[in-house]
Amino acid sequence: MDKEKKYELIPSDREGLYRVKALKDFGKVKKGDIGGYVECENNLSQYGKCWIFDNAIVRDNAVVSDNAIVWGKAVVRGNARVADKAQVFDNARIYHKVQVRGFAIVRDNAIVRDDVIVRDDAQIWGRAVIQDKAIVRGFAKVCDNVQIYDNALIQDNAQVCGFARIWGNAQVYCKAEIWGNAQIWGKAVIQGYAKVCGNAQIWDNAVIQDYASVGDRTSVYDKAVIQDYAFVMGNAEVCGNAIISSDKDYIVFKNWWSSGRYFTWTRSNNKWKVGCFFGTGEELVTKAYADNVEKGIEYKKIVDYVESII
C-alpha cells in the first residue's frame, strides 16, 4: 500500500502539524516537492491530483480530495471538504462543515464557515464572509466586504459586491447585480438583469426582476414588485402589492415644510406611504387634518396634484 501513496508526512516546525512530501510526479507536483501542512494523513487524499502548496494548512477533520488544491496561506479546518477541482488560496479561511466543490474558487481574505456550500464555478474573494447555510453556486461571484448568511442563495451569473448584505431566505440569481450598501433579506428575490445598489433595502416577499434598478435609499417590501425597465431611486418606499414597471408608476415627494419625511405614491394600487401610514389619498388627508389643519392643507395639495396628473 505504501508504494501506491503519492505523498508522505514529514516533521515540521509547527506543533501538531506535518508537512507533505511528494513521493511521485502528479499534476503540477514533482517527486520530492514539499507542500503545506496537515494534522494527519486523512487531511489530504492519496488519490487524484489534489495537493496542499506553500504554507497552507488543512487540519482537524477537514479533507482535500480529488483534484482540488489549497495554497498560499489558506486554512481549511473543522469538517470542511474541498473537492473536485476546487481551489482555496491566498489567506482564505474555510471552517466547520463547509463544502467547496466543482470548479469553485475561494481566495484573498474571504471567510466561509458553518454549513455553507460553494460549488460549480462560483467565486468568492476580497473580505467576503459567507456563513450559516448559505449557498453560492453556478457562476456566481461574491467579493469585497459582502456578508451572506442564514439560508440565502446566490446562483447563476449573479454578482454581489461592495458592502452588500444578504440574509434570511433571500435569493439572487440569473444575472442580477448587487452592490454598494444594499441589504436584502426575508424571502426577497432579485432576478433577471436587475440591479440593487446604494443603500437600498429589499425584504419580505418583494421581487426585483427583469432590467429594473433600485438604488439610493429606496425600500421595497411586503409583496411589491419592481419590474421591466423601472428605475426606482431617491427615498421611495414601495410596499403592499404595488407593481412598478416604469418611472411613471410612482412619485416621491419630500415634506419640506415641517418633518422632512418622504411621501411615496404608487400607481398600481393608488396608495400612499408616509411614515407609518399606508392607504389611499383620501385616508391620508383625513388623518393629516385630524392632526392639525395646516398639515391637512399641505397634504391635500400633494394628493390633489397627483390626482390631477394621473
Locations of regions flagged by a protein language model:
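Terminal amphipathic alpha-helical/low-complexity segments used for targeting or macromolecular assembly
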Residues: M1-K49, K254-I310
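Leucine-rich solenoid repeat scaffolds
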Residues: A236-S258, L284
